[in-house]
Curated annotation (Swiss-Prot):
It holds the Pfam family DNA_ligase_aden. Zn(2+) binds at residues 405, 408, 424, 429. It comes from Endomicrobium trichonymphae. DNA ligase that catalyzes the formation of phosphodiester linkages between 5'-phosphoryl and 3'-hydroxyl groups in double-stranded DNA using NAD as a coenzyme and as the energy source for the reaction. It is essential for DNA replication and repair of damaged DNA. The gene is ligA. The keyword Magnesium applies. This is DNA ligase. Gene3D superfamilies: 5' to 3' exonuclease, C-terminal subdomain, 6.20.10.30, BRCT domain, DNA ligase/mRNA capping enzyme, Helix hairpin bin, Nucleic acid-binding proteins. PROSITE patterns: BRCT, DNA_LIGASE_N1.
Length: 674
């Protein structure tokens, strides 16, 4: 790169980093993800390293990110609140570990590892055991005085509970908001001002900087302590000793904290947290690894912006910016017209993303998004990515809902003003029928293994399936002609089709796709009414007598079974030999008869759905909340408030291994807890 180009690139990177730093810390309105920001910073750092003549003392690479708002008084920290060096790969983490071991002459160093909370850094100061000051990190040297707001954070003690508290004690931690509280807050904000926070970090930051402390109190903020600032009259040998002292003082610590003695232990813990991060009740964006010994920390020292004895391993980005290429409109199996976003491909959390959900047309209007706009997308867990906001507006027009179904060109309607969704009401709409077929053969419905979308599309193209019952009249010659089908594959699929005829009524009801009726309600009404004919003869009053069915579900059921087209569908299925009866539940004679169960936390060997089916097959019942009527609570990993309530009510608590033994489903898979 020639000199002029080097200078231009450096100028651009510095301006961009300063701009994005302001958007992140001052406006709480970032345009790019953390990883994208770090990539810009690393590029600038590398150029400055290779071209030292261009390096300046005030470069963003040499300063702690952050700012001090003029809206608050300022507080000087007793010692700098530094940022941490970041790494985005386990390979880089291993290199850092090896560097530490080498610098310490391989002293069999202990390390601590804990989740990195995606919140807002804060410093707390206690004088003689009483909370006297709270401050943001600010620029690392000076922070904003948020003392009155910090006092409103739910789990921060006003007075330290430990005996003989030190005269001066400054500690640091992260202010955050629980996922469930964040969802509730966003619903309230949306209702009152028509906007919502993009993520929980923004919510915590905005709530902590309120001029009215009462608003902060209502936001249900929480605090995790993670590091020592300064303490008089007391010494700690290690980071873990310091944290245990904080626990005695009344602070809440993270449960997912581990002391490691080798790189393998660190990597194993990283894998567990990467795979289980979405089970936590708060957001984390990585893991923090520290040398445990405070004496060794002192030996390793600091750079101008971060400690050498700690590193932050950042998870793959859950947010990224990209361009919205096209808004595609598609038809669901119940006729709902749904928009979805076609994106320029971008890597997010290790996955290439090219689609995102837009939910409905009101969401498009709320986001003010259109084709060509640059958008921020987010992926939480394994759910479909969503568009969080428009970053750069390129298209000034408004995207309008279509007037006609994109599949059959029939008119589309809103059935009532309360509904958000538009529907195609043509019962012969090809797109609806295709979606209906996909649902009908799916695992939780008729469970015809191997009858996937590609098979369905070929049969539709060849006009071999025109009504549901046609599935059961397909011949060997029809299957063997499908792409990539040979003898064994054909035989297996024909067996799966034949086996599906014998499924209980409950699976058929779910497969039929009755509006508002899910799998659980399908099971309930099948057990109650026993046969398809009884359902056709039932009145609305008959349906509402079932405790789990209210007036809206009863109306959906009645409308469905009154429909002449439905009657024809069922008659055709009966003629094809499909079972229309719910078998009597076997009398198990176990202690589950009539017992009420609640499932909580993450189960390793079962899905919630599978565990519920096991319980019901043995005569038990499954409830969604704990009460005095609960007999058992099955507690998986990260069980929350339900487990706490169960303990208060003296409900029998079993873990997954005990549940497997009770049900005779003992698994050979070890139930890993962390």
């Amino acid at each position: 790169m020639i000199m002029g180009n080097i200078q231009n690139r450096i100028d651009y990177l510095r301006k961009e980093l300063i701009r994005h730093n302001g958007l992140y810390y001052e406006s709480n309105n970032p345009e790019i993800s953390d990883s994208e920001y770090d990539n810009l910073a690393k590029e600038l750092e590398q150029i400055e390293k290779e071209n030292p003549l261009f390096a300046l003392p005030d470069s963003p690479t040499k300063k702690i990110s952050g700012f001090v708002s003029s809206s608050f008084e300022q507080i000087k920290h007793s010692s700098p609140m530094l940022s941490l060096d970041n790494t985005y790969s386990q390979k880089e983490t291993a290199k850092w570990y090896e560097r530490i071991e080498k610098n310490l002459n391989n002293k069999n160093t202990e390390f601590t590892i804990e989740p990195k909370i995606d919140g807002v850094s804060a410093s707390l100061t206690y004088i003689n055991g009483s909370l006297t000051a709270g401050a943001t990190r600010g620029d690392g040297e000076t922070g904003e005085d948020i003392t009155e707001n910090i006092k409103k954070v739910k789990n921060i003690p006003y007075k330290l509970k430990a005996d003989n508290p030190p005269y001066f004690f400054e500690l640091r931690g992260e202010v955050y908001i629980d996922k469930s509280d964040f969802r509730k807050l966003n619903e309230e904000i949306l209702m009152s001002v028509g906007q919502k926070f993009a993520n929980s970090r923004n919510a915590a930051s905005g709530s902590l900087r309120q001029k009215n402390p009462q608003i902060t109190a209502e936001r249900k903020l929480r605090f995790f302590v993670h590091s020592l600032g300064k303490i008089d009259g007391k010494q700690f040998e290690s980071q873990s000793d310091f944290l245990q002292y904080c626990r005695k003082c009344g602070f809440q610590l993270q449960d997912n904290f581990k002391i490691c003695h080798s790189l393998k232990e660190i990597m194993d813990f990283m894998e567990i947290m990467i795979n289980n991060r979405d089970l936590l009740h708060y957001e984390i964006d990585g893991l923090v690894i520290k040398v445990n010994s405070l004496q060794l920390q002192k030996e390793l020292g600091y750079t101008n912006k971060s400690p050498r004895w700690a590193i932050a391993f950042k998870f793959p980005a859950k947010q990224a910016t990209t361009k919205l290429s096209r808004i595609r409109v598609q038809v669901g199996r119940t006729g709902i017209i749904t928009p979805s976003a076609i994106l320029e491909s971008v890597t997010l959390a290790g996955v290439t993303i090219s689609h995102a959900t837009l939910h409905n047309f009101e969401e498009i209007e709320r986001l003010n998004v259109n084709e060509g706009d640059t958008v921020l997308i987010e992926r939480a867990g394994d759910v479909i990515p969503k568009i969080v906001k428009v970053v750069k507006k390129e298209n000034r027009g408004f995207f309008k809902p279509p007037h006609n179904c994109p599949s059959c060109n029939s008119g589309i309607v809103k059935e009532n003003e309360e509904e958000v969704a538009y529907r195609c009401i043509n019962p012969e709409c090809p797109a609806q029928f295709r979606r209906h077929l996909i649902h009908f053969v799916s695992r939780n419905a008729m469970d015809i293994d191997g009858f996937g979308k590609a098979v369905i599309d070929q049969f539709l193209d060849r006009k071999k399936i025109q009504v549901l019952a046609d599935i059961y009249y397909l011949k060997y010659d029809d299957f063997i002609k499908l792409d990539l089908f040979k003898e064994k594959k054909t035989s297996n699929l024909m067996k799966a089709v034949a086996a599906s005829k014998k499924h209980p009524l409950s699976k058929l009801l779910f497969a039929l796709g009755i509006r508002r009726i899910g799998e659980k309600v399908s099971e309930i009404i099948a057990k109650k009414f026993k046969s398809m004919e009884a359902l056709f003869n039932a009145s609305i009053e008959d349906f509402t007598r079932v405790p789990e069915i209210g007036s809206i579900l009863a109306l959906s059921l009645k409308e469905f079974f009154e429909n002449k087209t439905v009657r024809n569908v069922i008659d055709n299925l009966i003629a094809a030999g499909v079972n229309m009866i719910e078998p009597e539940a076997e009398q198990s004679g176990t202690q589950f008869d009539g017992k009420m169960f609640v499932l909580t936390g993450e189960l390793k060997n079962h899905t919630r759905e599978q565990a519920g089916k096991i319980i019901r097959s043995l005569g038990g019942k499954v409830a969604s909340s704990v009460s005095k009527k609960t007999d058992y609570i099955v507690a998986g990993v990260n069980a929350g408030s339900k487990l706490k309530k169960a303990k208060e009510l003296n409900v029998k608590i079993v873990d997954e291994a005990e549940f497997d033994i009770l049900t005779g489903k003992l698994s050979l898979i070890e139930n890993t807890k962390f």
